[in-house]
Amino acid sequence: MACSCLLMASMQTLPGPGAFRTENGTLYLAFQEYYEAPQDPHNMADALSQTLSNSSLSQTLLSQTLISHTFLSQTLLSNSSLSHSLTLSQNSQTLLSQTLLSQTLLSLLSLTLSHSLKTLSNSFFSLKLFSLKLLDVFSLSHTRTSTREDGGDGQDGHEDRVWDVKWSPTGAVLASSSGDQTVRLWTREARDWVCLSTLEGPQKGTIRSLSWGREGNYLAAASFDSTTCVWEKGPSGFECFATLEGHENEVKGVAFSASGDYIATWFADEEEFDCAAILAEHSQDVKAVAWHPTRDLLASCSYDNTIRFYRADPDNADWICCDTLSDNQSTVWKICFNADGSRLAAVGDDRTLRVYQAFPPGNPQGAALPAHSSIYAPCLRNTLHSAINRLVCSDFAGIVTPSASDDKWKCIATITGQHTRPIYSVDWDPETNILATAGGDNIVRLFRETAVQPDTNTPSYELIGQFQAHDQDLNGLAWAPNQPDLQHRLLATCADDGLHVGNHKS
Protein backbone atom coordinates (compact mmCIF):
# COMPACT_ATOMS: atom_id res chain seq x y z
CA MET A 1 0.00 0.00 0.00
CA ALA A 2 1.40 3.39 -0.94
CA CYS A 3 1.47 6.21 1.57
CA SER A 4 2.35 9.80 0.76
CA CYS A 5 3.66 11.75 3.72
CA LEU A 6 5.55 15.00 4.23
CA LEU A 7 7.00 16.47 7.43
CA MET A 8 8.43 19.91 6.95
CA ALA A 9 9.09 23.32 8.47
CA SER A 10 8.97 25.49 5.35
CA MET A 11 7.75 25.46 1.75
CA GLN A 12 11.26 24.73 0.49
CA THR A 13 11.55 21.82 -1.93
CA LEU A 14 13.01 18.79 -0.21
CA PRO A 15 15.15 15.92 -1.50
CA GLY A 16 13.67 12.65 -2.68
CA PRO A 17 12.15 9.80 -0.67
CA GLY A 18 13.97 8.84 2.49
CA ALA A 19 16.08 12.02 2.58
CA PHE A 20 16.94 13.72 5.86
CA ARG A 21 18.73 16.99 6.52
CA THR A 22 18.93 19.78 9.08
CA GLU A 23 19.18 23.50 8.53
CA ASN A 24 19.36 26.25 11.16
CA GLY A 25 18.47 23.79 13.88
CA THR A 26 15.39 22.46 12.09
CA LEU A 27 14.87 18.89 10.97
CA TYR A 28 13.54 18.29 7.46
CA LEU A 29 12.18 14.92 6.37
CA ALA A 30 10.56 13.88 3.14
CA PHE A 31 8.68 10.65 2.40
CA GLN A 32 6.80 10.47 -0.86
CA GLU A 33 5.05 7.34 -2.07
CA TYR A 34 6.71 5.35 0.66
CA TYR A 35 5.97 1.64 0.26
CA GLU A 36 5.69 -0.65 3.25
CA ALA A 37 8.64 -2.89 2.46
CA PRO A 38 9.88 -4.83 5.51
CA GLN A 39 13.48 -3.73 5.13
CA ASP A 40 12.81 -0.03 4.47
CA PRO A 41 11.90 1.11 7.99
CA HIS A 42 15.20 -0.04 9.45
CA ASN A 43 17.20 1.64 6.71
CA MET A 44 15.27 4.86 7.18
CA ALA A 45 15.70 4.66 10.94
CA ASP A 46 19.47 4.26 10.61
CA ALA A 47 19.68 7.17 8.16
CA LEU A 48 17.56 9.44 10.32
CA SER A 49 19.39 8.43 13.49
CA GLN A 50 22.76 9.19 11.89
CA THR A 51 21.52 12.57 10.66
CA LEU A 52 20.23 13.51 14.10
CA SER A 53 23.38 12.40 15.88
CA ASN A 54 25.38 14.89 13.78
CA SER A 55 22.93 17.78 14.25
CA SER A 56 21.78 20.14 16.96
CA LEU A 57 18.03 20.57 16.79
CA SER A 58 16.45 23.64 18.31
CA GLN A 59 13.04 23.12 16.76
CA THR A 60 11.17 20.13 15.32
CA LEU A 61 7.99 20.93 13.44
CA LEU A 62 5.40 18.39 12.33
CA SER A 63 2.69 18.99 9.76
CA GLN A 64 -0.93 17.80 9.59
CA THR A 65 -0.18 15.12 7.02
CA LEU A 66 -1.08 11.60 8.09
CA ILE A 67 1.99 9.49 8.78
CA SER A 68 2.27 5.91 7.59
CA HIS A 69 1.22 3.37 10.22
CA THR A 70 4.12 1.14 9.25
CA PHE A 71 6.66 3.92 9.31
CA LEU A 72 5.59 5.07 12.76
CA SER A 73 5.24 1.68 14.35
CA GLN A 74 8.35 0.08 12.85
CA THR A 75 10.67 3.05 12.36
CA LEU A 76 9.98 5.54 15.12
CA LEU A 77 8.55 3.37 17.84
CA SER A 78 10.73 0.26 17.63
CA ASN A 79 14.17 1.77 17.00
CA SER A 80 15.81 2.57 20.32
CA SER A 81 18.75 4.51 18.84
CA LEU A 82 16.36 6.71 16.90
CA SER A 83 14.23 7.31 19.96
CA HIS A 84 17.33 8.31 21.89
CA SER A 85 18.49 10.67 19.14
CA LEU A 86 15.14 12.44 19.04
CA THR A 87 15.49 13.36 22.70
CA LEU A 88 18.72 15.29 22.10
CA SER A 89 18.65 19.07 21.74
CA GLN A 90 20.76 22.08 22.70
CA ASN A 91 17.82 23.80 24.37
CA SER A 92 14.70 22.69 26.19
CA GLN A 93 12.09 24.36 24.01
CA THR A 94 11.45 21.37 21.79
CA LEU A 95 12.18 17.82 22.88
CA LEU A 96 10.61 14.62 21.67
CA SER A 97 10.06 12.45 24.71
CA GLN A 98 11.78 9.06 24.66
CA THR A 99 8.89 7.79 26.76
CA LEU A 100 6.36 8.94 24.20
CA LEU A 101 8.26 7.32 21.36
CA SER A 102 8.30 4.00 23.17
CA GLN A 103 4.51 3.94 23.29
CA THR A 104 2.01 3.08 20.59
CA LEU A 105 1.13 4.61 17.27
CA LEU A 106 -1.97 6.09 18.81
CA SER A 107 0.09 8.20 21.18
CA LEU A 108 2.12 9.87 18.46
CA LEU A 109 -0.87 10.48 16.24
CA SER A 110 -2.99 11.97 18.98
CA LEU A 111 -0.20 14.18 20.21
CA THR A 112 1.49 15.45 17.06
CA LEU A 113 -1.09 15.53 14.31
CA SER A 114 -3.24 18.49 15.27
CA HIS A 115 -5.06 21.00 13.10
CA SER A 116 -2.13 23.44 13.21
CA LEU A 117 1.66 23.32 13.51
CA LYS A 118 2.56 22.67 17.13
CA THR A 119 5.64 22.00 19.27
CA LEU A 120 6.33 20.80 22.78
CA SER A 121 5.54 22.91 25.80
CA ASN A 122 7.96 23.18 28.71
CA SER A 123 5.13 23.79 31.16
CA PHE A 124 4.66 21.32 34.00
CA PHE A 125 0.96 22.00 34.58
CA SER A 126 -1.19 22.33 31.51
CA LEU A 127 -4.52 21.67 29.87
CA LYS A 128 -4.77 19.90 26.54
CA LEU A 129 -7.46 20.34 23.91
CA PHE A 130 -8.17 17.52 21.46
CA SER A 131 -10.30 18.07 18.38
CA LEU A 132 -12.98 15.40 18.01
CA LYS A 133 -12.89 16.00 14.25
CA LEU A 134 -9.23 14.99 14.28
CA LEU A 135 -10.09 11.77 16.07
CA ASP A 136 -12.37 10.88 13.18
CA VAL A 137 -9.79 11.83 10.55
CA PHE A 138 -6.86 9.99 12.06
CA SER A 139 -8.75 6.96 13.44
CA LEU A 140 -6.66 6.94 16.59
CA SER A 141 -7.83 3.52 17.69
CA HIS A 142 -7.73 0.58 15.32
CA THR A 143 -9.17 -1.81 17.90
CA ARG A 144 -12.81 -1.50 18.86
CA THR A 145 -13.86 -2.76 22.27
CA SER A 146 -17.54 -3.46 22.79
CA THR A 147 -19.55 -3.22 25.97
CA ARG A 148 -20.57 -6.23 28.00
CA GLU A 149 -24.32 -6.47 28.47
CA ASP A 150 -25.21 -7.07 32.11
CA GLY A 151 -28.33 -8.52 33.60
CA GLY A 152 -31.16 -6.28 34.64
CA ASP A 153 -31.30 -7.13 38.30
CA GLY A 154 -29.75 -3.84 39.39
CA GLN A 155 -27.00 -5.65 41.34
CA ASP A 156 -24.16 -5.06 38.87
CA GLY A 157 -22.46 -2.41 40.97
CA HIS A 158 -18.83 -1.34 40.98
CA GLU A 159 -16.28 -3.43 42.84
CA ASP A 160 -14.26 -0.43 44.04
CA ARG A 161 -14.78 3.20 45.01
CA VAL A 162 -16.82 5.31 42.58
CA TRP A 163 -14.97 8.42 41.41
CA ASP A 164 -17.37 10.20 39.08
CA VAL A 165 -20.99 10.26 37.88
CA LYS A 166 -22.34 12.03 34.79
CA TRP A 167 -25.85 12.14 33.31
CA SER A 168 -26.32 11.83 29.57
CA PRO A 169 -27.64 15.01 27.88
CA THR A 170 -31.18 13.64 27.87
CA GLY A 171 -31.01 12.49 31.48
CA ALA A 172 -32.03 8.96 30.51
CA VAL A 173 -28.68 7.32 31.31
CA LEU A 174 -26.32 7.79 34.24
CA ALA A 175 -22.64 6.90 33.73
CA SER A 176 -20.35 6.06 36.64
CA SER A 177 -16.61 5.41 36.80
CA SER A 178 -14.62 3.52 39.39
CA GLY A 179 -11.37 2.13 40.67
CA ASP A 180 -12.43 -1.23 39.23
CA GLN A 181 -11.36 0.12 35.79
CA THR A 182 -14.89 0.10 34.36
CA VAL A 183 -17.56 2.55 33.30
CA ARG A 184 -21.14 1.49 34.01
CA LEU A 185 -24.29 2.83 32.39
CA TRP A 186 -27.48 2.95 34.46
CA THR A 187 -31.13 3.64 33.71
CA ARG A 188 -34.31 3.68 35.72
CA GLU A 189 -36.95 0.97 35.33
CA ALA A 190 -39.99 1.60 37.51
CA ARG A 191 -38.42 2.39 40.90
CA ASP A 192 -35.21 0.41 40.36
CA TRP A 193 -31.91 1.45 38.81
CA VAL A 194 -30.62 -1.11 36.32
CA CYS A 195 -27.09 -1.46 34.96
CA LEU A 196 -27.52 -1.40 31.18
CA SER A 197 -23.93 -2.24 30.35
CA THR A 198 -20.40 -2.27 31.66
CA LEU A 199 -17.75 -0.63 29.49
CA GLU A 200 -14.49 -2.51 29.84
CA GLY A 201 -11.96 -1.02 27.47
CA PRO A 202 -8.19 -0.80 27.11
CA GLN A 203 -7.68 1.26 30.28
CA LYS A 204 -5.80 -0.48 33.09
CA GLY A 205 -6.15 2.03 35.90
CA THR A 206 -8.76 3.83 37.97
CA ILE A 207 -11.18 5.74 35.74
CA ARG A 208 -11.24 9.14 37.39
CA SER A 209 -13.49 11.33 35.26
CA LEU A 210 -16.30 11.16 32.67
CA SER A 211 -17.84 13.53 30.16
CA TRP A 212 -20.67 13.12 27.66
CA GLY A 213 -20.66 14.62 24.17
CA ARG A 214 -23.41 17.03 23.23
CA GLU A 215 -25.94 14.50 21.88
CA GLY A 216 -24.92 11.57 24.06
CA ASN A 217 -23.27 9.67 21.21
CA TYR A 218 -19.80 9.98 22.75
CA LEU A 219 -18.58 9.33 26.28
CA ALA A 220 -15.01 10.21 27.29
CA ALA A 221 -13.32 8.50 30.25
CA ALA A 222 -10.04 9.67 31.81
CA SER A 223 -7.89 7.15 33.65
CA PHE A 224 -4.99 7.01 36.09
CA ASP A 225 -3.14 4.86 33.51
CA SER A 226 -2.44 8.14 31.60
CA THR A 227 -5.02 7.50 28.85
CA THR A 228 -8.38 8.92 27.85
CA CYS A 229 -10.81 6.56 26.13
CA VAL A 230 -13.55 7.97 23.89
CA TRP A 231 -16.56 5.65 23.60
CA GLU A 232 -18.90 5.92 20.62
CA LYS A 233 -22.53 4.79 20.63
CA GLY A 234 -23.22 2.17 17.97
CA PRO A 235 -26.05 -0.19 17.01
CA SER A 236 -24.91 -2.80 19.54
CA GLY A 237 -23.82 -0.47 22.33
CA PHE A 238 -20.84 1.72 23.11
CA GLU A 239 -17.47 0.94 21.53
CA CYS A 240 -14.07 2.45 22.32
CA PHE A 241 -13.15 4.09 19.04
CA ALA A 242 -10.28 6.34 20.21
CA THR A 243 -7.66 6.14 22.94
CA LEU A 244 -5.72 9.33 23.66
CA GLU A 245 -2.31 8.32 25.00
CA GLY A 246 1.05 9.86 25.72
CA HIS A 247 0.63 11.51 29.10
CA GLU A 248 3.46 10.66 31.45
CA ASN A 249 1.20 10.75 34.50
CA GLU A 250 -2.42 10.12 35.40
CA VAL A 251 -5.15 12.01 33.55
CA LYS A 252 -7.14 13.78 36.23
CA GLY A 253 -10.18 14.79 34.22
CA VAL A 254 -11.90 15.17 30.87
CA ALA A 255 -14.62 17.46 29.51
CA PHE A 256 -16.41 17.90 26.18
CA SER A 257 -17.04 21.43 24.90
CA ALA A 258 -20.60 22.64 24.34
CA SER A 259 -20.15 22.35 20.58
CA GLY A 260 -18.87 18.77 20.93
CA ASP A 261 -15.85 19.58 18.78
CA TYR A 262 -13.26 19.70 21.56
CA ILE A 263 -12.23 17.45 24.43
CA ALA A 264 -10.21 18.99 27.27
CA THR A 265 -8.00 16.83 29.49
CA TRP A 266 -5.93 17.93 32.44
CA PHE A 267 -2.95 16.35 34.14
CA ALA A 268 0.51 17.08 35.55
CA ASP A 269 3.10 15.98 33.00
CA GLU A 270 6.71 16.96 32.75
CA GLU A 271 6.49 17.79 29.06
CA GLU A 272 3.57 17.66 26.70
CA PHE A 273 2.80 18.01 23.04
CA ASP A 274 0.26 20.59 22.00
CA CYS A 275 -2.79 19.20 20.26
CA ALA A 276 -5.46 21.74 19.50
CA ALA A 277 -3.93 23.85 22.27
CA ILE A 278 -1.86 23.68 25.43
CA LEU A 279 -3.11 26.09 28.07
CA ALA A 280 -0.23 26.51 30.47
CA GLU A 281 -1.32 29.44 32.63
CA HIS A 282 -1.58 27.63 35.97
CA SER A 283 1.54 27.36 38.13
CA GLN A 284 0.35 24.17 39.85
CA ASP A 285 -1.75 21.09 39.19
CA VAL A 286 -5.09 21.62 37.42
CA LYS A 287 -7.97 20.12 39.41
CA ALA A 288 -11.01 20.61 37.14
CA VAL A 289 -12.33 22.38 34.06
CA ALA A 290 -15.79 23.41 32.89
CA TRP A 291 -17.01 24.37 29.43
CA HIS A 292 -19.47 27.22 28.94
CA PRO A 293 -22.86 25.68 28.03
CA THR A 294 -23.40 27.65 24.81
CA ARG A 295 -19.99 28.68 23.46
CA ASP A 296 -16.36 27.60 23.41
CA LEU A 297 -15.27 29.31 26.62
CA LEU A 298 -13.25 27.10 28.97
CA ALA A 299 -12.73 27.65 32.71
CA SER A 300 -10.14 25.84 34.84
CA CYS A 301 -9.25 25.69 38.53
CA SER A 302 -6.06 24.64 40.24
CA TYR A 303 -3.91 24.00 43.30
CA ASP A 304 -2.54 27.52 42.68
CA ASN A 305 -5.82 28.94 44.12
CA THR A 306 -6.89 30.55 40.84
CA ILE A 307 -9.66 30.17 38.27
CA ARG A 308 -8.79 30.96 34.66
CA PHE A 309 -10.89 31.46 31.52
CA TYR A 310 -9.79 30.65 27.97
CA ARG A 311 -11.18 31.38 24.53
CA ALA A 312 -9.98 31.22 20.95
CA ASP A 313 -8.33 34.35 19.60
CA PRO A 314 -10.43 35.39 16.56
CA ASP A 315 -7.33 36.75 14.80
CA ASN A 316 -5.27 33.55 14.74
CA ALA A 317 -7.45 30.81 16.33
CA ASP A 318 -4.93 30.29 19.16
CA TRP A 319 -6.39 29.72 22.62
CA ILE A 320 -5.64 32.52 25.09
CA CYS A 321 -6.30 33.20 28.77
CA CYS A 322 -8.90 35.99 28.86
CA ASP A 323 -9.51 36.33 32.61
CA THR A 324 -8.06 35.18 35.95
CA LEU A 325 -9.79 35.04 39.36
CA SER A 326 -7.41 35.16 42.32
CA ASP A 327 -9.70 35.70 45.31
CA ASN A 328 -9.56 32.09 46.56
CA GLN A 329 -7.20 31.45 49.47
CA SER A 330 -6.71 27.73 48.87
CA THR A 331 -7.07 24.96 46.29
CA VAL A 332 -10.15 25.24 44.08
CA TRP A 333 -11.44 21.69 43.63
CA LYS A 334 -14.43 22.08 41.32
CA ILE A 335 -16.21 24.66 39.15
CA CYS A 336 -19.43 24.62 37.15
CA PHE A 337 -21.50 27.00 35.01
CA ASN A 338 -25.22 27.52 35.45
CA ALA A 339 -27.59 26.60 32.62
CA ASP A 340 -27.24 29.82 30.61
CA GLY A 341 -23.55 30.38 31.34
CA SER A 342 -24.01 33.72 33.09
CA ARG A 343 -22.65 32.47 36.42
CA LEU A 344 -19.93 30.15 37.68
CA ALA A 345 -19.85 28.33 41.02
CA ALA A 346 -16.57 27.29 42.68
CA VAL A 347 -15.73 25.23 45.77
CA GLY A 348 -12.48 24.30 47.40
CA ASP A 349 -10.24 23.54 50.34
CA ASP A 350 -11.39 26.57 52.34
CA ARG A 351 -14.89 25.04 52.76
CA THR A 352 -16.42 27.97 50.86
CA LEU A 353 -18.88 28.18 47.97
CA ARG A 354 -18.34 31.18 45.70
CA VAL A 355 -20.59 32.38 42.89
CA TYR A 356 -19.18 34.50 40.05
CA GLN A 357 -20.97 36.49 37.36
CA ALA A 358 -19.74 37.89 34.04
CA PHE A 359 -19.79 41.67 33.54
CA PRO A 360 -18.73 43.72 30.52
CA PRO A 361 -15.60 45.92 30.56
CA GLY A 362 -16.06 49.21 32.40
CA ASN A 363 -18.65 47.78 34.78
CA PRO A 364 -16.62 46.26 37.63
CA GLN A 365 -19.33 46.73 40.25
CA GLY A 366 -22.14 45.16 38.25
CA ALA A 367 -25.56 46.51 37.36
CA ALA A 368 -29.13 45.30 37.41
CA LEU A 369 -28.90 44.60 33.67
CA PRO A 370 -25.33 44.61 32.31
CA ALA A 371 -25.16 46.12 28.81
CA HIS A 372 -23.12 44.08 26.32
CA SER A 373 -22.10 44.49 22.74
CA SER A 374 -23.83 41.26 21.81
CA ILE A 375 -26.67 39.01 22.88
CA TYR A 376 -26.12 35.30 23.19
CA ALA A 377 -28.88 32.71 23.12
CA PRO A 378 -29.24 29.36 21.33
CA CYS A 379 -31.58 30.95 18.79
CA LEU A 380 -29.46 34.10 18.31
CA ARG A 381 -25.97 32.79 17.70
CA ASN A 382 -23.67 35.02 15.65
CA THR A 383 -26.36 37.56 14.89
CA LEU A 384 -25.11 40.78 16.48
CA HIS A 385 -21.65 42.18 15.87
CA SER A 386 -21.90 45.82 16.94
CA ALA A 387 -23.12 47.91 19.85
CA ILE A 388 -26.72 47.44 21.00
CA ASN A 389 -28.75 50.66 20.93
CA ARG A 390 -32.21 49.21 21.52
CA LEU A 391 -33.51 45.93 22.89
CA VAL A 392 -37.01 44.63 22.20
CA CYS A 393 -38.24 41.51 23.99
CA SER A 394 -40.91 39.13 22.77
CA ASP A 395 -43.09 36.87 24.87
CA PHE A 396 -41.64 33.56 23.68
CA ALA A 397 -40.39 31.32 26.44
CA GLY A 398 -36.70 31.28 27.13
CA ILE A 399 -33.87 33.30 28.57
CA VAL A 400 -31.65 35.61 26.51
CA THR A 401 -28.32 36.09 28.22
CA PRO A 402 -26.17 39.13 27.39
CA SER A 403 -22.63 37.97 26.74
CA ALA A 404 -19.33 39.07 25.25
CA SER A 405 -15.94 37.49 24.69
CA ASP A 406 -14.17 40.12 26.83
CA ASP A 407 -16.44 39.85 29.88
CA LYS A 408 -14.84 40.06 33.31
CA TRP A 409 -15.94 37.71 36.06
CA LYS A 410 -16.65 39.00 39.56
CA CYS A 411 -17.49 37.18 42.80
CA ILE A 412 -21.07 38.15 43.68
CA ALA A 413 -21.75 35.74 46.55
CA THR A 414 -19.70 33.88 49.18
CA ILE A 415 -21.27 31.13 51.28
CA THR A 416 -19.25 29.98 54.30
CA GLY A 417 -19.83 28.23 57.61
CA GLN A 418 -21.82 25.27 56.23
CA HIS A 419 -19.34 22.53 55.36
CA THR A 420 -16.90 21.44 58.06
CA ARG A 421 -14.32 19.93 55.70
CA PRO A 422 -13.10 20.74 52.15
CA ILE A 423 -15.78 20.84 49.44
CA TYR A 424 -14.89 18.58 46.52
CA SER A 425 -17.85 18.92 44.18
CA VAL A 426 -20.57 21.36 43.11
CA ASP A 427 -23.33 21.21 40.52
CA TRP A 428 -26.08 23.57 39.38
CA ASP A 429 -29.55 22.17 38.72
CA PRO A 430 -30.31 23.34 35.15
CA GLU A 431 -34.03 23.70 35.84
CA THR A 432 -34.35 25.10 39.38
CA ASN A 433 -30.91 26.79 39.76
CA ILE A 434 -30.43 24.98 43.07
CA LEU A 435 -26.74 24.53 43.91
CA ALA A 436 -25.64 21.21 45.40
CA THR A 437 -22.29 20.85 47.18
CA ALA A 438 -20.53 17.85 48.72
CA GLY A 439 -17.16 17.06 50.23
CA GLY A 440 -15.12 15.54 52.99
CA ASP A 441 -17.80 15.84 55.68
CA ASN A 442 -20.00 13.30 53.81
CA ILE A 443 -22.91 15.79 53.67
CA VAL A 444 -24.74 17.04 50.56
CA ARG A 445 -26.02 20.59 50.97
CA LEU A 446 -28.54 22.42 48.78
CA PHE A 447 -28.57 26.20 48.29
CA ARG A 448 -31.15 28.45 46.61
CA GLU A 449 -30.93 32.10 45.58
CA THR A 450 -33.34 34.17 47.67
CA ALA A 451 -32.91 37.82 46.67
CA VAL A 452 -30.95 40.14 44.38
CA GLN A 453 -29.81 43.62 45.37
CA PRO A 454 -30.96 45.85 42.46
CA ASP A 455 -28.10 48.34 42.77
CA THR A 456 -25.26 45.80 42.60
CA ASN A 457 -26.99 42.77 41.10
CA THR A 458 -25.56 40.61 43.90
CA PRO A 459 -27.67 37.67 45.09
CA SER A 460 -28.14 36.05 48.47
CA TYR A 461 -28.23 32.28 48.99
CA GLU A 462 -29.82 30.22 51.73
CA LEU A 463 -29.36 26.61 52.79
CA ILE A 464 -32.62 24.79 51.96
CA GLY A 465 -31.61 21.22 52.72
CA GLN A 466 -28.84 18.81 53.69
CA PHE A 467 -28.51 15.06 53.98
CA GLN A 468 -25.93 12.32 54.37
CA ALA A 469 -25.93 10.04 51.33
CA HIS A 470 -22.67 8.22 52.13
CA ASP A 471 -20.53 7.19 55.08
CA GLN A 472 -17.28 8.28 53.41
CA ASP A 473 -15.90 11.27 51.49
CA LEU A 474 -18.07 12.33 48.56
CA ASN A 475 -16.10 12.46 45.31
CA GLY A 476 -18.74 13.92 43.00
CA LEU A 477 -22.38 14.75 42.36
CA ALA A 478 -24.57 15.60 39.36
CA TRP A 479 -28.15 16.78 38.81
CA ALA A 480 -30.11 14.92 36.15
CA PRO A 481 -31.06 17.13 33.16
CA ASN A 482 -34.39 17.29 31.33
CA GLN A 483 -36.62 16.45 34.28
CA PRO A 484 -40.17 17.71 33.63
CA ASP A 485 -41.15 17.47 37.30
CA LEU A 486 -39.71 20.57 38.96
CA GLN A 487 -40.85 19.40 42.40
CA HIS A 488 -38.83 16.19 42.45
CA ARG A 489 -35.23 16.33 41.24
CA LEU A 490 -32.81 13.45 40.71
CA LEU A 491 -29.34 13.95 42.17
CA ALA A 492 -26.58 11.36 41.75
CA THR A 493 -23.69 11.21 44.21
CA CYS A 494 -20.60 9.01 44.35
CA ALA A 495 -18.16 8.25 47.13
CA ASP A 496 -15.60 5.73 48.29
CA ASP A 497 -18.48 3.51 49.40
CA GLY A 498 -20.47 3.52 46.15
CA LEU A 499 -23.09 5.28 44.04
CA HIS A 500 -26.37 6.83 45.21
CA VAL A 501 -29.29 8.37 43.29
CA GLY A 502 -31.73 10.40 45.35
CA ASN A 503 -35.09 12.01 44.57
CA HIS A 504 -35.17 15.43 46.20
CA LYS A 505 -38.12 17.76 46.57
CA SER A 506 -37.26 21.29 45.49
UniProtKB/Swiss-Prot annotation:
GO cellular component: cytosolic [4Fe-4S] assembly targeting complex
Pfam families, A to Z: WD40 (PF00400)
Functional summary from the UniProt entry: Essential component of the cytosolic iron-sulfur (Fe/S) protein assembly machinery. Required for the maturation of extramitochondrial Fe/S proteins.
Similarity comment: family membership: Belongs to the WD repeat CIA1 family.
UniProt xrefs under CDD domains: WD40
Entry keywords, A to Z: Repeat, WD repeat
UniProt cross-references to SUPFAM superfamilies, sorted A to Z: WD40 repeat-like
UniProt lineage: Eukaryota, Choanoflagellata, Craspedida, Salpingoecidae, Monosiga
Any GO BP annotation: iron-sulfur cluster assembly
Placement of WD repeats on the sequence: 157-196, 202-241, 246-281, 282-320, 327-366, 418-457, 469-506
Protein's name in the database: Probable cytosolic iron-sulfur protein assembly protein CIAO1 homolog
